[in-house]
């Protein structure tokens, strides 16, 4: 005999017996994690070329091509046999050094304290030095986004309203040097700019599209709270209907 509890029967509505309950007060909308902005275009400078505003994947493939790897990024093609790909690293010389610069904009309306609290996320920091507006920064020990391969960098003190630049400098090409997007995390909104997106002040406050509200790259939770006054009688059941809702999972909590 197991200790599994018997499932309660599913509620089946009887036509004509449902009554809509109107909310009281204004709905509360709150983002439960820091927002994020991705920057996936960059300038790439090597001893052989100087490319501007390149999509990261094109920059990555071109970087391998320039250094004698005709297939481009080997890790995108097939599973490595023995150490075939790792052994490619021996062919990269000192003159294969490169510099990748990511430009992004911060709206002057951003609160100064929020600006200082912004962090950057850069993959594989052991392969290059990271600098923000010319100031070299190191990863914050024990702080990472998603997993430990995405360490955080405290860059807020070096940021400024307007154009900013995060730069990666590699002393030489490396077989693991996949030039990927960089990310910025903080309590801000992300809005379309003349080119790409920019970090702006504000908080999500209404129902509707996250993308249009300033969360185009956000993938965590948003809490929506609404008050209802109801009278519970014997035999009464309550149903929550999410109209025009697009999402992965919705969790409903009653009184916390």
Regions found by a protein language model. Name each.
Residues 1-5, 248:
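Carbohydrate-binding surface patches
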Residues 6-93, 124, 139-148, 153-227, ...:
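An acidic-aromatic loop/edge-strand motif
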Residues 84-96, 100-109:
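Regulatory/sensor and coupling segments of signal-transduction and defense proteins
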Residues 103-134, 166, 228-256:
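Aromatic-lined ligand-binding clefts that engage carbohydrates, nucleic acids, or primary amines
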């Amino acid at each position: 005999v197991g200790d599994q509890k018997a499932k309660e029967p599913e509620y089946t509505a009887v036509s004509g017996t449902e009554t809509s309950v109107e909310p009281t007060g204004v709905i509360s909308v709150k983002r439960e994690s820091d927002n994020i902005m991705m920057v996936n275009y960059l300038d790439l400078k090597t001893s052989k070329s100087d490319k501007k505003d390149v999509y990261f994947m094109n920059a990555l493939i071109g970087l391998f091509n320039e250094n004698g790897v005709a297939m481009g990024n080997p890790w995108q093609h097939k599973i490595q046999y023995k150490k075939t790909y790792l052994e490619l690293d021996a062919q990269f010389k000192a003159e294969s050094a490169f510099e990748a610069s990511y430009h992004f904009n911060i709206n002057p309306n951003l609160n100064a304290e929020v600006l200082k609290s912004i962090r950057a996320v850069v993959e594989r920091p052991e392969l290059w030095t990271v600098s923000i507006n010319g100031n070299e920064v190191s990863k914050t020990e024990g702080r990472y986004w998603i997993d430990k391969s995405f360490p955080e960098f405290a860059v807020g003190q070096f940021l400024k309203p307007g154009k900013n630049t995060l730069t990666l400098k590699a002393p030489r090409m490396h077989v693991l040097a996949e030039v990927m997007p960089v990310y910025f995390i903080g309590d801000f909104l992300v809005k379309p700019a003349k080119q790409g997106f920019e970090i702006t002040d504000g908080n999500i406050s209404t129902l509707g599209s996250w993308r249009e509200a300033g969360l185009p790259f956000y993938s965590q939770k948003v809490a929506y709270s609404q008050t209802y006054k109801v009278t519970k009688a014997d035999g009464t059941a309550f149903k929550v209907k999410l109209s025009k809702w697009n999402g992965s999972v919705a969790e409903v909590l009653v009184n916390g």
